[in-house]
Amino acid sequence: MKDPYIAHLRKSDGQIQSVQAHLKETAALAKVFAQKLNLESAGELLGLMHDFGKYSRKFQKYIHDETGLFNPDLDDEESTPDGSKVDHSTAGAQWVYRELRKFGAAQGIGEFLGQMLGLCIASHHGEGLIDCLDGEGNPKWVERFNKTDELTHLAECERNADEVVQQKAKELAGEKLIRSLLNAVKPILSDQAT
């Protein structure tokens, strides 16, 4: 069996949590929390994709370096010399945005809902949502969502991700999710129109 992609290493006992286990466990919790809003599928998808970038070789090199684990297959990768973190949330944000924008493309429905969920993923390590607009009202979130694959490693993560994670994400990112999100935002949009 190949070594699992590592999400976390518990300092107290050295126990490794695989990316697959981390994403599935977070998805299960997020689904329960989102139940209060009748947005279980949205919560589950957010949990499943929030750390999708941890499937990248760059993140795996980073976590091995940070934890002192040794993996000779990663030895040719450079570590981050300045101690900076590796972006591991944008890949999931881009994936969700790309998949949801396919729905209701003519009306921009999927685009809008993909932005909403993508922003949640891209912002999950901050102290709130990332800036969505600059001082002039220009869409600043576009910079994050348009980051190159060289920086987000989305294509690599899609190749590396466990099949069970990818299948569940594809299953969740469908019309049922779009309908539930629309039902949730309709009252807000109706209030804006009046």
Task: Tell me the role of every PLM-derived stretch.
Residues 2-194:
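Accessory nucleic-acid engagement/destabilization modules that flank
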